[in-house]
Amino acid sequence: MKTNLVVLITFTILISLGFWQLSRLKEKKLFLASMQANLTSPAINLAEIQDSLPYHKVKITGQFLPNKDIYLYGRRSMSSGKDGYYLVTPFKTIEDKVILVARGWFSNRNKIIITQATNDRQHEIIGVTMPSEKTRSYLPANDIKNNVWLTLDLKEASQTLELNLEDFYIIAEGKDISNLDILLPLSINHLAAIRNDHLEYALTWFGLAISLIVIYVIYRRNVISV
């Protein structure tokens, strides 16, 4: 009797997890469809967006704030470069919002020259809004002293730069306004490759549930035969 109850509870849990993954599959499909629609649409003024949801193509007007650059290490998904940094600079819009903008990638050997990239002229930036990154336990902490960041945590950036940053950042499209050849443009193509694996997860849970029943049936037959 106890075995029957354990099997029933386990089977119910496995089936529930399978249906939960099917629900997540539907949600992810809607999310990806909405994201792709936003990314392929013309850029809209940031002020027209009613919330700070990520993956909107926007345009902002304002100026970069000097002496506030962040050097974000790595991320080959945004650039083909191997050993270098993403130049991330706070941008103050004409609406008086301050937003971090990922402007381009530069190699490690050009770290000194890149300080010439920021000026206080007004510009229009077109790019894609991105959510704040979460600190991962397997990554070292950001090296604030040497300005080497591994995670673009916007709360930490706000504290470090002493700025009231928006809760999203922007990946700028195209060549940076500095026209420095050493600052390579970024790409958002990696966003189109976001996977939706929830069907595989659902099939895994359902498969485990079926396996459980098969094992239970074999077990019961052996018990009866004995």
UniProtKB/Swiss-Prot annotation:
Its main location: membrane. Keywords: Cell membrane, Membrane, Transmembrane, Transmembrane helix. Pfam families: SURF1. The chain crosses the membrane at residues 3-23, 199-219. It is found in: Cell membrane. InterPro entries: Surf1/Shy1 (IPR002994), Surf1/Surf4 (IPR045214). PROSITE patterns: SURF1. It is a multi-pass membrane protein. GO terms for cellular component: plasma membrane. Belongs to the SURF1 family. This is SURF1-like protein. It comes from Rickettsia felis (strain ATCC VR-1525 / URRWXCal2) (Rickettsia azadi).
